[in-house]
């Protein structure tokens, strides 16, 4: 997910996006724990997407 895509969303949409990413991260962590996750880089990508969304939420809150 690109930051430019996220910048076009408002705070409510970013909140929903964050919630879905956190659920996806939880699912991936459970798959990794049970050794069902073949592509472990997905976990890193989701973690970075979460960081992007949180950064944008902080920026929007400061304005």
Curated annotation (Swiss-Prot):
Signal peptide: none
GO cellular component: cytosolic large ribosomal subunit
Disulfide bonds: none
GO MF entry, a single one: structural constituent of ribosome
Regions annotated as coiled coil: none
Gene3D superfamilies recorded: 1.10.287.310
Keywords carried by this UniProt record: Ribonucleoprotein, Ribosomal protein
Domain of life (superkingdom): Bacteria
A GO BP annotation: translation
Any Pfam family the entry gives: Ribosomal_L29
PROSITE patterns, sorted: RIBOSOMAL_L29
NCBIfam families per UniProt: L29
Similarity comment: Belongs to the universal ribosomal protein uL29 family.
Cross-referenced HAMAP family: Ribosomal_uL29
Name of the protein in question: Large ribosomal subunit protein uL29
């Amino acid at each position: 997910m690109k930051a430019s895509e996220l910048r076009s969303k408002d705070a409510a949409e970013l909140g929903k996006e964050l919630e879905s990413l956190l659920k996806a991260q939880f699912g991936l962590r459970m798959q990794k724990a049970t050794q069902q996750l073949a592509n472990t880089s997905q976990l890193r990508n989701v973690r970075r997407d979460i960081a992007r969304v949180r950064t944008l939420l902080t920026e929007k809150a400061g304005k």
